[in-house]
Amino acid sequence: MNFLMLYSNQWVTGNKPIGLASLSAILKQSGHQFTLFDCTEYSIIAENAKENDRKTELGSKQMMHNSNALEFKYAENHERLPVPKPVTHKDLIDEFLRTIDRIKPDMIGFSGLTDDYPLGLGLMRHAHSSFPSIPTIAGGIHPTV
């Protein structure tokens, strides 16, 4: 089977989806395909933002989560880290739907923390609307509790 999993991390933090990593390993060991659509690679910006606003908004988000959240040690040589791609909410939806169309999964799942749940649920609703024959499943702390 071909699985697509959504990690709806919208805060550009270094949280690692341990559950998805474990699931990926088990599925791959059993001969299945596993693709991860990781929202950490994107920074959602306002629909009407200009290019300079996009850079400022992205920079503010990175600074907030790299230093103020105190979750992670400040990275030396942070300029070497990948910069999340600034996208509008609609762009992110379109990218997710294109990924589904491209890999043609047999099942789509998502995992995320409570803060990420609205984004993940929204993307999954778009997936279900556009591809109603593909089963969907949710996991992680928020859907479980």
List each language-model region with its residue ranges:
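Generic signal for short, ordered secondary-structure residues
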Residues: M5-L6, H78-E79, D106
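Nucleotide-activated donor-dependent transferases that construct or modify glycoconjugates
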Residues: M1-V12
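Glycosyltransferase specificity loop/lid
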Residues: G14, F34, S43-A49
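Glycine-rich beta-alpha loop elements in corrinoid/cobalamin-binding modules
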Residues: G19, L23-S43, P82-V145
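Glycine-rich, highly charged phosphate/nucleotide-binding loops
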Residues: I45, K50-A69, K73-D101
